[in-house]
A protein has these predicted regions:
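Active-site or metal-binding loop neighborhoods of secreted/extracellular toxin and effector enzymes
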Residues: 130-172
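Hydrophobic/aromatic-lined pockets within catalytic cores
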Residues: 5, 58, 171
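Hydrophobic, gly/ala-rich membrane-insertion helices/peptides used by toxins and envelope proteins
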Residues: 1-23
């Protein structure tokens, strides 16, 4: 009789952790912070926007924000376990509750939308640039554009027209 059969039908904590790891692990390549340092075609982005998008950050008030890609190791942002949604559309966009440096995001119900795991950081920068090239004003400094692979991306610009943040929209 194994040890786990005595747990009254519950998945033991150890097995839950492994099961969770398998759900989050994918067949897609993981990247690291060095890969972010080597991104090309970033002229349309502010200095801080790429870390906001790819790593998550804390604003001046200490509030968590950003984090729209989960395939880079060593970032300050992370998905809160058990909150990752199934794909919201054919492109592979999903959403999840996030935290940055252990501080849960509060804006947007604590959720971020995520670029598909199968895309590389460079492919995401390129997709944002494609959306930037055909974006239309939503209101204020918020715009919406579409990448060549069909991802609708919301873009927020600063007063100089540089990208502060960009994230996939949940549109089907």
């Amino acid at each position: 009789l194994d040890v786990y059969s005595k747990v009254k039908g519950k998945i033991p904590f150890f097995n839950r952790k492994i099961e969770s790891w398998y759900q989050n692990a994918s067949e897609f390549k993981m990247y690291n912070l060095d890969d972010l340092a080597n991104l090309e075609h970033t002229e349309n982005f502010t200095e801080k926007s790429l870390s906001h998008i790819f790593e998550g950050d804390l604003n001046k008030k200490g509030r968590a924000g950003g984090y729209h890609y989960d395939m880079i190791e060593g970032t300050s942002g992370s998905i809160i376990e058990g909150t990752k949604s199934p794909a919201l559309n054919d492109a592979g966009i999903y959403e999840a509750k996030v935290e940055v440096n252990g501080i849960p995001k509060k804006a947007n119900g604590g959720k971020s939308t995520f670029f598909p795991d199968h895309m590389s950081p460079q492919e995401i920068v390129d997709a944002i640039n494609e959306a930037y090239s055909n974006m239309e004003l939503i209101e204020g400094s918020r715009y919406s554009g579409t990448s060549q692979n069909g991802i609708d991306i919301e873009i927020i610009l600063n007063s100089e027209g540089k990208i502060i943040t960009a994230y996939p929209q949940k549109i089907e």
